Every structure is written in C-alpha cells, then in structure tokens.
A protein has these predicted regions:
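Metal-dependent amide/peptide-bond hydrolase catalytic core
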Residues: 4-126
Length: 126
C-alpha cells in the first residue's frame, strides 16, 4: 500500500506543475499472492518535465515523500537511478512550421507538451 500512496502523491505533485509527468511503469511484487501481505516490492519511476530544473524539483519532492511514507510505515527503501536524460524542448521555429502545415491542411492546431524524448532528444541537438 505504500507504493499506492506514493503513486497518488506523484500524480498530485506532477499535476501541480501543470506540465510535469510522473508515472510508475513497472510494479513487481515477488512471490505475490492474493492472500499474502507482500514484504517487498520493486517499482520504476519515470519523471518528466519541460526543464531539467522542474524535473529535478519533482524528483526531490517524490523521493522526500517516499522517505516520509517509509518512515511513517516502518519500512525502508533503496533507490537506484537507471537513466537520466535532459529535457529536450522542440524548436519554436519547427513548432511554427508544423502548425502552419497542419493549419494549411484545414485541420485544427493543438499544442501539447509531450514527455516523449526518443526522437525529440535527437532533433533538439540540431
């Protein structure tokens, strides 16, 4: 239940920024069973924001909340970072080009922040 509590905090905290994203993509409960209180679990955190500073503040808050939850519940935790990537905002000029093309096709233009970084990180380098 501690992880569920953390996940709810992460959702609220990310929403408070307006454009941050915090997700748990993996949740593993070794030897889990429907009638057993688990003694251990492993989970992933994915934190994204439009700037490194905003993401780092989100990370600090999430890890502080994790520590507080564990303290209150008499649990312990370890955290291991597996990947860190810089925020990769797309060029305003490229955004304008895409918006013009979409509008020229007679389609509505919608702006949204995408936390997806795979292609954006590479295009950001140009």
């Amino acid at each position: 239940m501690a992880v569920a509590e953390l996940m709810l905090f992460m959702e609220r905290r990310a929403l408070s920024d307006g454009d941050s994203v915090a997700t748990v993509g993996q949740l593993q409960v070794p030897a889990g069973s429907v009638n057993v209180v688990p003694g251990r679990c492993r989970f992933s955190l994915d934190l994204r924001a439009p700037s490194n500073a905003q993401r780092d503040a989100l990370e600090r808050d999430v890890l502080a909340q994790l520590a507080a939850i564990c303290e209150r519940r008499g649990l312990h935790h370890t955290a291991r970072e597996s990947m860190r990537a810089s925020a990769a905002p797309s060029s305003q000029a490229w955004q304008a080009r895409w918006e013009d093309a979409v509008a020229a096709a007679g389609l509505p233009v919608h702006r949204m922040l995408s936390g997806a970084g795979h292609d954006a990180m590479k295009l950001h380098e140009f």
